[in-house]
A protein has these predicted regions:
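Aromatic- and glycine-rich beta-strand/loop motifs that create alpha-glucan
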Residues: 1-26
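Secretory targeting signals
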Residues: 18, 26-87, 112, 116-186, ...
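Transmembrane helix segments
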Residues: 31-41, 189-230
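Transmembrane helix boundary and interhelical loop/hinge segments in multi-pass membrane proteins
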Residues: 82-103, 107-108, 115
Length: 287
């Protein structure tokens, strides 16, 4: 298993897909900040001297500066995650390398290694980007002269980063599960990406618009809202960042569930999709 993970790490840590879809977050943030601060200091964007954040409380400043953790769970962020996962899982088919690897290693360990390296690289990329986002927020205030609120501690920052990471985790894992299964079933990077984009978009759209369409089929819409993962992913994120249940107003009444229920349903979807991926690959004819 460790050999398989090492092989995947060697393959993907410098792969173009990793540079373009994982390392792009910290690199892109750095470039954007450098451009923004240059514009600010040059006075091109208006009079320099602060961005108006001086009146923030410590809690507000921390919330602003750990805000990058909203990106992995956002629709666009999930699209980028899906693109990377599609390359990791379907790339072997396009490169015709499975037939060279499969006879020498257990198929279960091969897929497990892909899950491990995809998650590890994404975790490193997003964590580095989130920490840089925090650092750049502080540097911006220092350079522009905005006051930094008193009472900000390392412990409070770490707690906020941890909550943000936990809030993003279900969406990231679910996206990995969607796209990995599509990659194994279709054997195509493009098809896996398209399926991942479509499923993620439908998930988000249904969560948003279900209250509007409920009157046309109340029982069906209500049942789907309870069992599909969209609401439950958002509910876990709400608990992680705000400490409260996510309440969705429907014409028939407010919909909400407990954290335990949302964790169970989200976990069941992830386990089922990942399990299907392992099962499908073990039965697949590799030519």
């Amino acid at each position: 298993m460790l050999d398989a993970i090492s092989a995947e790490a060697l393959k993907f840590k410098r792969h173009r897909a990793t540079w373009g879809l994982v390392w792009i977050w910290p690199i892109g943030l750095t470039l954007i900040w450098l451009i923004a601060i240059a514009v600010e200091l040059s006075g091109v964007g208006g009079e320099a001297g602060g961005d108006g954040r001086g009146g923030l409380t410590a809690a507000g400043w921390i919330a602003d500066n750990v805000g990058f953790w909203g990106v992995p769970g956002d629709t666009f962020g999930r699209y980028i995650i899906g693109a990377f996962v599609a390359v990791v899982f379907a790339g072997e088919y396009g490169w015709n390398t499975w037939k060279l690897i499969v006879p020498h290693r257990a198929r279960t360990s091969l897929i497990a290694a892909k899950y491990a390296i995809a998650f590890i690289l994404l975790a490193i990329g997003f964590t580095l980007a989130a920490l840089l986002f925090n650092l750049f927020g502080w540097l911006t205030d220092v350079i522009t002269g905005d006051s930094i609120p008193a009472g900000i501690t390392a412990g409070a920052l770490l707690k906020a980063h941890g909550a943000g990471a936990l809030a993003a985790l279900p969406a990231v894992l679910l996206t990995i599960a969607y796209v990995s299964l599509a990659a194994i079933l279709t054997r195509s990077t493009v098809a896996a990406l398209v399926i991942g984009l479509v499923v993620t978009t439908i998930e988000q759209l249904f969560r948003t618009f279900a209250p509007m369409i409920e009157p046309s089929a109340p029982s069906l819409v209500g049942a789907l809202y309870e069992v599909l993962p969209g609401y439950h992913v958002a509910n876990v994120a709400s608990f992680a960042t705000e400490g409260r249940v996510l309440e969705i107003p429907f014409p028939s009444g407010t919909f909400s569930t407990s954290l335990g229920t949302s964790l169970a349903i989200t976990g069941a979807w992830i386990v089922a999709l990942v399990g299907l991926t392992f099962w499908s690959f073990r039965r697949q004819d590799i030519n």
